[in-house]
């Protein structure tokens, strides 16, 4: 994360760190070049795709909480790193419109290629914990609403018996030493009729198999919570040549006794 700019020295350090980050993204991972190659399905293109997507990526990395903070002129001008936006400032509606039209598969491929570079450059040659590359896997809720929904939304009844629509995914990322890298994400899928929506374990197995197929031996150990103490999931890890560490709560200590016996 870039240093806070409370002093002139802090401002200078922040600018240097941002410049170094952008240079590294361009020279090593070729991310700006790949962004320029994304498909642009807009009929009208008053602002180039790159001039929207690249700033969005940078602001996500800088952990800005709201696009309104960035893409609202003129009051946010001082909050916007000048290195990231050149030319006409896109309005937040233009940002939303473009992002909604980008093919997620193209973004996923850029991410996968970034992981390939990390492996090729042996970023994790010393491991992340005790000499091993350890990765955690868990479910993450991404979006929730009782009013808005899409065909890919999962659904359930909340405490007031209203239907809640949400997106949920399973994420696998390194734990331990920096850098903390997300290897991949698998969206859980809705099911028709009376069947329950796809569960976290199903998505996790699919994610592990996909990562193994795409990246080979991407980690040594997978760490998970008690939900993943499941024979089909553990067998999937074994098939992919992965060890596992699963954390159980104290009230489930009988499972330890069963395992020891």
Predicted segments with their positions:
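Short, contiguous clusters of charged residues that form electrostatic/catalytic patches at enzyme active sites
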Residues: 53, 167-170, 202-209
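Short, positively charged, Gly/Tyr-enriched micro-motifs
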Residues: 45-115, 230, 237
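A general structural motif
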Residues: 129-132, 167, 180, 214-219, ...
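Short, conserved catalytic/metal-binding motifs centered on acidic residues
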Residues: 55, 70, 91, 95, ...
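An internal, acidic/charged active-site-proximal segment
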Residues: 187-261
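Basic, short loop/linker segments at the boundary and entry of helix-turn-helix/winged-helix-like folds
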Residues: 22-54
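Charged, often Cys/His-bearing segments associated with DNA-binding zinc-finger transcription factors
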Residues: 1-26, 32
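Active-site-proximal, Lys/Arg-enriched surface segment
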Residues: 96-178
């Amino acid at each position: 994360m870039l240093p806070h700019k409370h002093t002139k020295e802090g401002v200078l350090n922040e600018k240097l760190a941002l410049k170094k980050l952008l240079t590294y993204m361009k020279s090593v991972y070729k991310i700006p070049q790949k962004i320029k190659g994304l498909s642009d399905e807009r009929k009208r293109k008053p602002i180039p795709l790159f001039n929207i997507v690249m700033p969005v990526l940078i602001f996500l990395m800088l952990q800005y909480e709201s696009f309104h903070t960035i893409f609202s002129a003129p009051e946010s001008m001082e909050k916007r790193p000048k290195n990231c936006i050149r030319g006409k400032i896109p309005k937040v509606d233009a940002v939303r419109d473009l992002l909604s039209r980008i093919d997620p598969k193209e973004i996923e491929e850029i991410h996968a290629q970034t992981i390939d570079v990390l492996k090729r450059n042996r970023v994790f040659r010393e491991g992340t914990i005790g000499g091993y590359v350890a990765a955690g896997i868990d479910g993450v809720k991404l979006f929730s609403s009782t009013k808005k929904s899409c065909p890919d939304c999962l659904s359930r009844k909340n405490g007031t018996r209203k239907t809640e629509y949400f997106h949920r995914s399973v994420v696998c990322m390194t734990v331990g030493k920096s850098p903390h890298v997300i290897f991949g994400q698998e969206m859980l899928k809705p099911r028709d009729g009376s069947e329950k929506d796809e569960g976290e374990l199903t998505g996790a197995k699919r994610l592990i198999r996909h990562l193994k197929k795409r990246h080979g031996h991407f980690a040594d150990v997978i760490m998970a919570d008690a939900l993943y103490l499941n024979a089909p999931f553990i067998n999937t890890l074994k098939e992919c040549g992965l060890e596992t560490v699963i954390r159980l709560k104290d009230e489930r200590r009988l499972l330890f006794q069963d395992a020891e016996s």
